[in-house]
Swiss-Prot record:
It holds the Pfam family DBI_PRT. Gene3D superfamilies: 3.40.50.10210. NCBIfam families: nicotinate mononucleotide-dependent phosphoribosyltransferase CobT (TIGR00303), PRK04447.1-6 (NF003373). This is UPF0284 protein tll2306. PANTHER family: PTHR38811, UPF0284 PROTEIN SLL1500. Coiled coil: none annotated.
Length: 371
């Protein structure tokens, strides 16, 4: 790890210090408040037993993205259409993101890129479908990939014309496995590097599945062929959105392994289609919990991708909620833009750790009481 961003001590820099520091400085002060965009998707890879801890059962994992999206949009309610599914330990990172969205008053857009169950009315339909399991080598049709790319490109143009910069987040259960597959398909060694919702990353299981999917790929496959074979709908939408938005504004890809894979995919598409690539405009932002996960080593993946990676130093050791303190034991690490929202809080409001913990604790108080 390189160290801290000099102008914002609560932000750490894992890779790409020069670009990361310059990017942080450009987005540090009001009135340059961003919009938060969260793209929800689904891959049937998530139904494989043991593949993810983001929902205890395959049935739970089908609603995880919908529940996280609902909590982002509506916050605490007397009743939920999709209640947050129980985790092995800890609280959904949607709790962090929602608390910080409220405190910063960020505009929010939640997109359905392909979900297995009906979305909420507030979610923007992109006309996608869930991806099949990556082991089939036919996760998405070429037509669906082209459609999702156009949707992402169009929304990237629209949003970048309305906001000075964008935080783009995701929720895809099983998405670190498709991230591993996408990186490998693009020629980037990623085995044993991607994160996991499990306390100890399940690298062996992921690698076995990815090998089955990659076996279907022809030699020298182009990026669209790769993602159609082994990817998920979020990857296509976010890569297009970020690539288009970065022509005119800054982009924070809020996540870990999945967003590093999206960064690599977007760059590969830019090279393949001879589109402008603005690396100074795009950084990946995550959490300290993921950076310090010795079973993942995503900083090594970021180095291989040559992707600037920053992270919040947020620490819940002194939280009054056991579900938040569980983050310090590695039970939950990142998701739904939690790291990116915290980074925005450091940049825009100058919040230190105690202030940010208090903001999240106060929402957790209400959540624990169901009000």
């Amino acid at each position: 790890m390189v160290g801290n961003c000099q102008s914002v001590p609560m932000i750490g820099v894992a890779t790409g210090a020069a670009i990361a520091g310059a990017w942080s400085d450009r987005h540090r002060q009001p009135p340059t408040f961003p919009a938060l965009v969260c793209v929800l998707g689904f891959t049937e890879t998530a139904l494989i037993p043991g593949i993810s801890a983001a929902g205890q059962t395959p049935s739970d994992r089908q609603i995880t993205a919908l529940a996280d999206g609902e909590f982002l949009l509506r916050g605490i309610q007397p009743q939920y259409h999709y209640a947050l599914p129980p985790l092995t330990a800890g609280a959904s990172p949607a709790l962090i993101s929602r608390a910080l969205i409220e405190a910063l008053a960020l505009p929010l857009y939640v997109f359905d890129a392909g979900l297995p169950l009906p979305r909420l009315p507030e979610m923007i339909d992109l006309g996608g479908t869930p991806a099949r399991c990556l082991t089939t080598g036919q996760a998405m049709t070429p037509q669906m990939v082209a459609h999702l790319w156009e949707q992402g490109w169009s929304w990237g143009a629209k949003l970048s014309s309305q906001y000075p910069w964008l935080i783009i987040a995701e929720c895809v259960v099983g998405g670190t496995t498709t991230a591993l597959a996408l990186c490998e398909s693009l020629g980037i060694p990623a085995r044993d590097c991607v994160g996991s919702s499990h306390r100890q990353s399940n690298h062996t299981q992921k690698w076995s599945l990815v090998q089955k999917g990659l076996a279907h790929l022809p030699p020298q496959a182009d990026p669209f062929t790769c993602v159609a074979a082994i990817g998920d709908p979020m990857q296509v939408v976010v890569a297009a959105m970020a690539l288009r938005a970065s022509q005119t504004c800054g982009v924070l890809l809020a996540g870990g392994s999945q967003m590093i894979a999206v960064y690599a995919f977007g760059r590969a598409i830019a090279q393949w289609r001879q589109l402008p690539w603005r690396p100074e405009q795009i950084v990946v932002g995550t959490t300290r919990w993921l950076i310090e996960d010795q079973t993942a080593q995503i900083h090594r993946l970021a180095e291989r991708v040559q992707c600037p990676l920053i992270y919040t130093q947020l620490d819940f050791s002194l939280s009054r909620h056991p579900a938040l303190r569980a983050y310090e034991q590695g039970f939950v690490k990142e998701g739904v833009g939690a790291g990116g929202c915290a980074i925005a809080g450091h940049l825009l409001a100058g919040w230190r750790n105690s202030e940010m913990v208090d903001i999240v604790d106060r929402l957790a108080d209400r959540w624990a009481k169901g009000m």
